[in-house]
């Protein structure tokens, strides 16, 4: 997750936010991924899923126009994965951020407004979903 190992979770988020003109507060970013209470822990003290959430908080703190998420729920349990997907969906809608989510979990595609399926490096399907579902409506 490319965390700096001698910096706390909070410091990792703050480090990324330093390059932005209007970053999200590091504590707000960590709270949004459910890790405010772990802000002063170092990466080695965090589980793989917690490290993944710190990296998501770090990305969100920069308030990007485009957020690339490669398997953002890969190291997360079901409930935490749902929380992160809900956060990404809400951030996308509220902040008008484009979120590109790469996943092997086809069951979550109904939440997307644009779905591109690939096989062997080639696009096999390109669909615009006029009625994306809220994460709460999806089961997998």
Question: Which positions does each model-derived feature cover?
Answer:
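ABC family nucleotide-binding domain
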Residues: 1-118
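Conserved beta-strand-loop-alpha-helix hinge in the C-terminal portion
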Residues: 122-140
């Amino acid at each position: 997750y490319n965390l700096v190992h001698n910096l706390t979770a909070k410091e990792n988020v703050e480090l990324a936010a330093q390059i932005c003109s209007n970053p999200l507060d590091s504590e707000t970013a960590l709270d949004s991924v459910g890790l405010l209470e772990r802000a002063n822990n170092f990466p080695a003290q965090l589980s793989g899923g917690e490290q993944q959430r710190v990296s998501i908080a770090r990305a969100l703190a920069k308030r990007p126009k485009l957020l690339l998420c490669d398997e953002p729920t890969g190291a997360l349990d079901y409930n935490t994965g749902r929380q992160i997907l809900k956060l990404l969906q809400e951030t996308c809608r509220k902040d008008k951020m484009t979120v590109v989510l790469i996943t092997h979990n086809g069951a979550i595609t109904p939440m997307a407004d644009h779905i591109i399926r690939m096989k062997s490096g080639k696009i096999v399907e390109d669909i615009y979903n006029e009625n994306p579902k809220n994460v709460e409506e999806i089961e997998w």
